[in-house]
UniProtKB/Swiss-Prot annotation:
The modification Phenylalanine amide is found at residue 48. Expressed by the skin glands. Keywords: Amidation, Amphibian defense peptide, Antibiotic, Antimicrobial, Cleavage on pair of basic residues, Cytolysis, Fungicide, Hemolysis, Immunity, Innate immunity, Membrane, Secreted, Signal, Target cell membrane, Target membrane. Belongs to the frog skin active peptide (FSAP) family. Temporin subfamily. It is found in: Secreted; Target cell membrane. This is Temporin-SHa. It comes from Pelophylax saharicus.
Amino acid sequence: FLGTINLSLCEQERDADEEERRDEPNESNVEVEKRFLSGIVGMLGKLFGK
């Protein structure tokens, strides 16, 4: 009985870890997009600000 509970908890942890791994690339892509877009906005601001 305890072995079944332990196995179930391990499976839940593994599923949570897999979900985290799937989320990480998306988060890094969003941060890259934010930096890229802020750079473009900054360049346009300098270009049109002159």
